[in-house]
């Protein structure tokens, strides 16, 4: 009973650590910006100084910098936690066993699933925002703050496509899912990690599609027996959303809307089919 309770609270601990680390890095960053602004400030009123400081700590560059630093630190810390306490080092499946089973099929499956889910998530957000219109401005403000609605800078791409997915996979599909899996059936553990993954984004509209995507990631991590497939899928999904610009939006009329929606459903289905086929060949 004690071991069960220990695993239950441990499955929530990574999310708490992520939140605390984000806050800590933000405050440290704000402190350094304040010191820099105070050191370089020469003239003007206090309100001018405060306005300049406020503009700096709410800027896209500051937000992206904080996310990049926290994700890099969390990825290193959680890697050692996962490797030392959770990872099954005696597992027969290698880190990229699912990919090696049939590389071409796996790569095509990842690409199809990434593109398909990007479109589906976009349409899902549009539908949800019709029922909850107040959620859309919150989401747009969040995306503006993270620089995802403007030009794609190198730090932003590095965080969104590389460091962020590694950090989040170690946190949710690595630690959270693994601890939950010790005391719960797969479906329950998958729902728990997906809910925490959605909650981490702290935006109701984004939480809707990140929950759905989290379920898919958890499913393939379970299939692969390790984090490699989750990381690959997460990187690919984010890369499509960030690097393709407006590609994941679509539909100027009902017919085009339907065709793109249907095509995204087919792409998602084929992607899942190909990756499942690879998993069976690996077994």
List each model region and its residues.
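N-terminal, membrane-interfacial amphipathic/helix-forming hydrophobic leader that caps
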Residues: 1-107, 115, 239-283
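Alpha-helical membrane-protein architecture signal
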Residues: 5, 9, 13, 104-108, ...
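Transmembrane alpha-helix boundary/anchor motif
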Residues: 23, 27, 115, 119-123, ...
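Functionally important transmembrane alpha-helices
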Residues: 23, 27, 31, 194, ...
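Membrane-spanning helices that line or support transport/gating and their immediate boundary helices
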Residues: 27-35, 123-131, 170, 179
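Juxtamembrane helix-loop-helix connectors linking adjacent transmembrane helices
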Residues: 42-46, 51-57, 89-164, 182
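Short, amphipathic, aromatic/basic-enriched membrane-interface segments that mark the entry/exit
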Residues: 163, 174-184, 199-205, 228-231
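Membrane-interface helix/loop boundary segments of multi-pass membrane proteins
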Residues: 167-192, 219-226
